[in-house]
Amino acid sequence: MKKLLGVLALVLSVSSLAMADQDTVKEIHFSSEFRQSYTDKKTNTGNGLGIAGFKGQNKEKTRWRNVLGGDLNLVDEGNLGLRFEFQNDQDRVKNDFDYQNKKLVTNGVYDKSQTWENDIALYKDVKLGSWTAKWDLGWKYKSTNGNGRYAGHRGTSNEIYVGPGFGIDFFGHHFDGKAQFVYFDQSGEKDGDNAWSGSDFINGKTSGVGGNFDLATNGKVFDNRAGNLNYYVTLNNHLRDAKGKLVETGKDAKSTVYLDYVTGATYKTPELAGFYGLINTENEWEKQTARHGFKNNFSVWTGLGYKTGIDLSVGTLTLNPEVKYRVVNKETVKGVYDDGRYSSTDKYTREYNELRAGLNVGLEVK
């Protein structure tokens, strides 16, 4: 938390300096959220399926996530835009369970870690003939360290990306897309969307080049006195070609495309004095083309929130506390996504119910 407050102070200081030189802040946002997941870990019967209740022995992972982000207009630097987001996760994993023999291995916390991520990008509209596109030049970073008696560096990944955004009509729908050239490196447990983590390579790390080709669309099904229903689709395709030989085979790693396809819909009730309810259903399918297996996650969330806006001299401050519960979760895994809980099969379904409670704060500058 101290590091996050330090980042916040730094960003606000830089923003103040930027504004003094006629650069401007478009928006800034902060969120803090507590997450607790549960699964069935009852001795003799636990199978990682079904709603097993909010019992201590069924706890899986406790996460505290804090996010700080914003958007600046750098007037003195040729009207470049600067988009940034910093994320910190504090994780505790609890109750190590042997699903094969249906018994608890460790009662209570058996791992603690902290992960820092950032995504910082300069962007600008570039005109090529009659075509105008927003180009990004950005850097993504992710690093994890163990905490307390689990201390130790667990891995780092970096991604430098550059490329334009564009629009395309596909199956009768308009998609917003991105095409980016990528340089990446990774070490330890981090994979950077590669099919293998850094520790899978002989030197414990690797680097390479690739590309991102992402498509996204969304829209309204209805918006009336009964509330509103929105849908969304994202189709992410990330090519990674890493240099180096794998520990397992002694051969060069194959190039791979990470496929991440998400479809979902969210219904929100009409607001009553700022309060609203919501239901979200979503399906996410993931695969690495260079490896055997896939992961498919279907979930249904319910939630209750409150949203209000406060007019200030500099803009509008939005406060949005929200509580959500994942009542349905079916995560089917196969092959490389298998966590080894069963020796007899590499394909099975697991379930994690999850409770989330958090606060979102945003400032839209006039």
Language-model region placement:
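Detector for outer-membrane/organellar transmembrane beta-barrel domains
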Residues: 171-291, 300
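Transmembrane beta-barrel strands of outer-membrane/channel proteins
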Residues: 30-38, 82-90, 135-143, 177-185, ...
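Outer-membrane beta-barrel "beta-signal"
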Residues: 325-327, 349-366
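Short glycine/proline- and aromatic-enriched beta-strand/turn motifs that initiate or cap beta-hairpins
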Residues: 20-73, 81-97, 356
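Short loop/turn motifs that connect adjacent beta-strands in outer-membrane beta-barrel proteins
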Residues: 20-28, 73-82, 123-135, 166-178, ...
